[in-house]
């Protein structure tokens, strides 16, 4: 099967390997000419690893015309602009699979909602998300990984499950809760920030366990608000992705939290990072959402104060500890 991947960063290029391992034909698109050149030379553009039987182009129209299945692997801040470009170029219906994590600031929309808003209905065949605990650094080495394909169309979820599952190292489950999967995958980045701060400040495992437990509760509040299934919080895109993002040395968001603890501002982190750190934009979006709808999300509030307002950790921590006594649930 022919498949187009939009965005040849760490994850997009790694998924190209997954698909070619399953004997599919993959064409990557990127505006980064250096990435395109490396891929066409048989090299992964980010990691020191081969990437064979994959081609790349810098022409979006050529990439879109290549296949009827489009994988979206671009940072959230570029998603709407990219989709507007795609909408202008489509002449036949396409199916989309999103692998980017986050929600859009100001609108609070998920990727599936942006796609439906921008791509004309006659040209949108199907949509699914592919999420879960999946550091590209491990998948490129073909280490065991589990993901979830979520779609409101069960048949399409099954199609994506079969397409991306590799018997030796990658297994995909299906879900009908597209909403929950998208929200969980976005929210876990916020908890990774805070865990990075806790570790950098030598807090113990007790505090990290407390953060994860109360954080999962806030995750379920958001999933319920968006009318998703709270059970999804316990799945791969929820608890699974949270563990990977909040505790791994590969996690950009965890490492960003450690830098925040060292006194580096979020803008300095963004300016010095070679790869996108989605959590900053996601945190801002969730903070504005909870203000607008009066949601009780104390970890979101504390995270925003630490990262965007540069409040002292001791002050923010004291505020959290002084919240009124209450039942756990």
Curated annotation (Swiss-Prot):
Stored Pfam families: NAD_Gly3P_dh_C, NAD_Gly3P_dh_N
Question: Which residues does NADPH bind?
Answer: 11, 101, 136, 252, 278
EC number(s)?
A: 1.1.1.94
Q: Which GO terms describe its molecular function?
A: glycerol-3-phosphate dehydrogenase [NAD(P)+] activity; NAD binding
Q: Name one GO biological process term.
A: phospholipid biosynthetic process
Q: Which reaction does it catalyse?
A: sn-glycerol 3-phosphate + NAD(+) = dihydroxyacetone phosphate + NADH + H(+); sn-glycerol 3-phosphate + NADP(+) = dihydroxyacetone phosphate + NADPH + H(+)
Subcellular localization: Cytoplasm
User: Which Gene Ontology terms of cellular component type are present?
Assistant: cytosol
Q: Which UniProt keywords apply?
A: Cytoplasm, Lipid biosynthesis, Lipid metabolism, NAD, NADP, Nucleotide-binding, Oxidoreductase, Phospholipid biosynthesis, Phospholipid metabolism
The principal location of this protein is: cytoplasm
Please give the NCBIfam families that the UniProt record associates with this protein. Answer: PRK00094.1-2, PRK00094.1-4
Task: Give the protein's function.
Answer: Catalyzes the reduction of the glycolytic intermediate dihydroxyacetone phosphate (DHAP) to sn-glycerol 3-phosphate (G3P), the key precursor for phospholipid synthesis.
* Family stated for the protein in its record: Belongs to the NAD-dependent glycerol-3-phosphate dehydrogenase family.
Q: PANTHER family annotated for this entry?
A: GLYCEROL-3-PHOSPHATE DEHYDROGENASE, GLYCEROL-3-PHOSPHATE DEHYDROGENASE [NAD(+)] 2, CHLOROPLASTIC
- Give the protein name, as stated in the record: Glycerol-3-phosphate dehydrogenase [NAD(P)+]
Taxon lineage: Bacteria, Bacillati, Mycoplasmatota, Mollicutes, Acholeplasmatales
């Amino acid at each position: 099967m022919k498949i187009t991947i939009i965005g040849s960063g760490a994850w997009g290029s790694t998924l190209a390997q997954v698909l070619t391992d399953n004997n599919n034909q993959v064409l990557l698109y990127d505006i980064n000419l250096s990435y395109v050149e490396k891929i066409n030379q048989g090299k992964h553009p980010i990691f020191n690893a081969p990437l064979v039987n994959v081609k790349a182009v810098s022409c979006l129209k050529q990439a879109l015309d290549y296949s009827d299945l489009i994988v979206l692997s671009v940072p959230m801040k570029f998603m709407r602009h990219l989709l507007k470009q795609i909408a202008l170029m489509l002449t036949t219906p396409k199916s989309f699979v999103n692998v980017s994590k986050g929600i859009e600031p100001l609108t609070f929309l998920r990727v599936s909602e942006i796609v439906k808003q921008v791509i004309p209905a006659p040209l949108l065949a199907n949509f699914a998300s592919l999420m879960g605990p999946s550091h590209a650094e491990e998948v490129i080495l073909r280490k065991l990984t589990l993901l979830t394909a979520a779609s409101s169309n069960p048949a399409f979820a099954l199609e994506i499950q079969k397409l991306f599952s590799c018997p030796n190292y990658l297994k995909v489950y299906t879900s009908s809760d597209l909403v929950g999967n998208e929200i969980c995958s976005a929210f876990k980045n916020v908890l990774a920030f805070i865990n990075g701060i806790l570790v950098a400040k030598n807090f113990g495992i007790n505090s990290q366990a407390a953060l994860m437990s109360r954080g999962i509760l806030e995750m379920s509040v958001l999933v319920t608000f968006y009318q998703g299934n709270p059970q999804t919080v316990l799945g791969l895109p929820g608890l699974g992705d949270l563990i990977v993002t909040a505790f791994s040395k590969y996690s950009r968001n965890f490492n960003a939290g450690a830098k925040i603890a060292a006194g580096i501002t979020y803008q300095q982190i963004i300016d010095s990072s070679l790869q996108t750190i989605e959590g900053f934009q996601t945190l801002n979006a969730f903070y504005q959402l909870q203000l607008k709808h009066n949601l009780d999300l104390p970890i979101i509030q504390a995270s925003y104060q630490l990262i965007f307002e540069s409040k002292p950790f001791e002050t923010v921590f004291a505020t959290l500890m002084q919240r009124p006594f209450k039942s756990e649930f």
